[in-house]
Structure formats: structure tokens, C-alpha cells
Amino acid sequence: MKFKRNDTITQGEKTYTVTDFLGEGGQGEVYLVECEGSEYALKIYKDHVSADFRYNLKNNIAKGAPSSEFLWPIELLDFDDGDLGYIMDLRPKNYVSFVSYLTGKNKFADKSVMLKWCISLCTAFKKLHEEGYSYQDLNDGSFFFDPDTGALLICDNDNVTADKKNLGVLGKMRYMAPEIVRGDKTRSGSVQLPDVHSDRFSLAVILFMALCLGNPFEGERLKNYDIVDEEAEYEMFGKDPVFVYHKTDKSNRPIRGYHSAVLRRWAYVPIYIKEAFHRTFVDGLRDRENERTTPLEWIKLLSRYRDELITCGACGYDYIVGYAEKKRYTECPSCNTPTKDFCTLHIGRSDIALDLGKRVYEPHVDKFSSKYGSVVGRVVSNKNNPSLW
């Protein structure tokens, strides 16, 4: 470790005191530091970084975070020995890693909260791309959530660069766009590097994993390999990726007894969400620039999904009423209790299944609003007669 507890670091007029070692990754070490009564995280790079990397980091700090969801670098630290580090805000303790959700250690309070997190994720990347950036390395370790509220935080933002520019980071296997895995050539003859279009692919992978708890390209073809090594991963995620719910190529369906969560959850995903995944993971392999679902498209689709949710009064399971399905659900998918009566609120093009606690958001009443997390109304029970809403 470069620092030990109570070491001090002076930068200009500020002095940071190291209070704890938080951990390390491939790039560097992270410390808990204190300055003027506030706590921050300090990341120190293990190796000397390039001048381009330093310039990019400095420029990102000057421009500031695209939104509050990004744990963005806020101050650059240069050391006499040539090492580089930066200060960022500390992740609050009520936030847990997305990885812990995938492994079952932590859960969202309910499906509506999970969808709020997904919408926030898409909104954050919409803003990032609008600022002219691409994230370039979306993976399961990049995100955190508050299990109770669905609030989002995004870490590892030091690799974010201007779109079409790359500083050496390609991404993490299982999340990278296939053309990045393969090292395809662009029209100009250069190697295809991460950009906004590869971000869109990786974002769809994260959303699929959030909704279905599995990877969209891991299915029956896993049986072709004695061990999933680099060669196997290259074939599954680069050379010849096949979406597990490809409409015509059924060679890679989820394995019963192994991908149980995917099989169970996919069955109750709304058809318009399924179509968006198919477009990205099938058509988007052929046409990366036009057929990958954009963050804004995801926001609208996921908001529609949230509008359709109702809660089973018997077991508390959240499921959709099925406005867009050929056959509406007449019983709870979890406990088979018959679907209770509910009212539908029609606002413009939105159909909102009313349930106790259901929220109405600003875009419902203002078609020009992009505040998909801003609540303007909520279904509550009558104080004098709780059976009335």
C-alpha cells in the first residue's frame, strides 16, 4: 500500500488525512480520507498513467459530472514521485453493489423499485451521451443501488472519455459489444473501439440481467465447452453470439434447471420489452448504429412497464396486467390467486394500472418533460375509510 493510516496529503490549500484502506483493483488502490470534516474516497493509480489519460481526467473534473448519479472525480492529485490520484465523493453505506443483487445477497424492495433503478440508469447514460462522452466499460461492477428506494450510483468514471476516443480500455467480457470483442475494422480501416453504440449494447446487457438475472448470451451453447475459457468466451460473446431468446435461432435457449431465473422471469416480461431486447441483441449485431435501443427508448419502455404493475394482495408479488399482451393475466404468477379488480387511469397515451401506492410521474401530465423520476401524484387510502382510495 502506498499510504498508511494517519498519513497526510497536501494539495494546494487542502490537506487530506488517510483514515482507512478501502480496497484495490487492477488499476489502483482506494483509501478513505478526511478533509475539513468531510470524508472522501481517494484513488491512487498503481502505475504511471499516460499524458493523455491525465489530460482526460483533468478535463472531466473541470466539466463536472453529467448527473448526480455519477461518483465523478472532483480533484486531481499529483505526487512528487510521478504517481497520480484523484478525490471523489464517498459512496453512502445504504448503497449496495449490483453484483450483490445478481448473486442473491441483496434485493430490491419490489419490482417497481427495481424498475426505478433501471430507468435512472438509462437516464444517467442518456445524459452522459448528450454531454459527448461514452462510458466504454459498462459491467456489473460499475453500479450500486439503494435496496429500499432504487436510487442509483455509478462508479469507475475515470475511464469515461469523449465519444470516439479511447485510452486503452475495451471493457469486460460478457458485457462488451461483439464488434469490440472481435476487434472489427471501421470504415476507415482502424480497429473498432468502444463508443456510444457499444455503450448501448452493454446497457441492454445490464438491463437484461436486472430483469432476468442471467446473461442474454449464455444458454444451451454452454454445453459445447468443457470449460468456459477465453476461447469459449470469444465464440459466445464475439465470434458468434446468439441471443437466448432469438426468434428463429433456438440453439441457445436457457438451460432448464440451470437458468431457472431467466426462464421464470422472461415469461412475465412485457412483450414490448422483449422486442427491444431482440432488436438490440439480434438486429443490433448487424446494424450497430441504428438497431440498438437507445437510453431514451428504454426510459419510455421501462416507464410503461412500471405503469402496468399491480401487486398481489395475497403474496405481495408485483406483475403486469398485460395491456399489450394478447391475453391478460387473470391470476398472480407467484401464488395463482385470481387477479383483483383494478381501475385504469388514462392520461394521453399512458395506461396506468391503479393500485395502492401507485405513482403518477411528471411526463404523464407534461409530454415535454423528461423528469421520469419526478412524482406528481400518488394513490393513497382514505383516512376515514381505508378501503377507499
Where are these regions (language model features)?
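ATP-binding glycine-rich phosphate-binding loop
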Residues: K2-E36
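Conserved beta3-strand ATP-binding lysine motif
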Residues: K43-K46
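Conserved structural core of kinase catalytic domains
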Residues: L71-W117
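Catalytic-loop of the protein kinase fold
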Residues: F125, H129-P147
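Conserved catalytic-loop aspartate of Hanks-type protein kinases
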Residues: D199
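Conserved C-lobe activation region of Hanks-type protein kinase-like domains
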Residues: L207-K274
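Forkhead-associated
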Residues: L356-W389
